[in-house]
Amino acid sequence: MNRLLQRQLFLENLLVGVNSTFHQM
């Protein structure tokens, strides 16, 4: 359960990072 939550948080952070990079371009 904890591992699943960690992966979800990681995916959300990754998506936010990609969005930030995309907006900076």
Swiss-Prot record:
Transit peptide as a keyword of this entry, yes or no, is no
Keywords assigned by UniProt, alphabetized: Host cytoplasm, Host mitochondrion
Q: Name one GO cellular component term.
A: host cell mitochondrion
**Places the protein is found:** Host cytoplasm; Host mitochondrion
Q: What is its main location?
A: host cell
| Assembly, per entry | Interacts with NSP2 and NSP5.
Tell me the protein family, please: Belongs to the rotavirus A NSP6 family.
Q: What is this protein's record name? A: Non-structural protein 6
